[in-house]
């Protein structure tokens, strides 16, 4: 079960040209259905993730962006999605990275065991469905750990190759984040200060 994230500038630029219009764009949901997934129509599905060009790039209003992503994640949490699929790179980036920020600010984590909800672009989802190696797709660079999702989907992967480049050289590993552990394991809680 997964929520498609399609309420963004991609759906709004040419609202009459898209299948389903800007309010109910169907292309992403159709891809999910065709690949055997089950879409979730959660209450804030059509709400902006906060990346909007004006909101983040021009005005750099981080508070607005975090608040919008928080609202969307809270809205989809009761549905317990396996992962989120986005057609916009901004949505994918924000819904992935803001989970860490929300965990630090609010002490709230999402997903199975509080480990976060993986967020994939539709290209990454297509690559996995077509049998590409997840590390070749760059999935190790996500903020939220993708291994539990890969296991649930039955996708073979080599944990030892996660941070190796094409020629077997180590490409670097991101530092652990609060999203990949339980709230009780966090070093500090901002609200408690």
Where are these regions (language model features)?
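Iron-sulfur cluster-binding electron-transfer modules in prokaryotic oxidoreductases
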Residues: 1-193
């Amino acid at each position: 079960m997964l929520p498609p994230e399609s309420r963004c500038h991609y759906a709004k630029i040419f609202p009459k040209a898209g299948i389903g219009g800007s309010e109910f764009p169907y292309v992403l949901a159709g891809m999910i259905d065709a690949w055997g997934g089950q879409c979730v129509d959660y209450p804030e599905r059509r709400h902006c993730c906060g990346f909007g060009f004006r909101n983040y790039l021009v005005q750099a209003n981080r508070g607005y962006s975090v608040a919008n992503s928080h609202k969307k994640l809270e809205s989809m949490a009761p549905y317990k999605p396996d992962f989120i699929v986005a057609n916009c790179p901004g949505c994918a980036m924000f819904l992935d990275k803001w989970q860490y920020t929300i965990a630090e600010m609010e002490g709230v984590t999402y997903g199975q065991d509080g480990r976060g909800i993986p967020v994939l672009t539709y290209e990454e989802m297509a690559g996995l469905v077509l049998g590409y190696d997840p590390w070749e797709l760059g999935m190790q660079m996500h903020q939220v750990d993708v291994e539990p999702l890969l296991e649930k989907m039955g996708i073979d992967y080599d944990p030892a190759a996660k941070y190796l480049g094409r020629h077997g050289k180590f490409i670097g590993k991101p530092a652990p984040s609060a999203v990949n552990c339980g709230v009780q394991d966090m070093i500090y809680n901002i609200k408690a200060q």
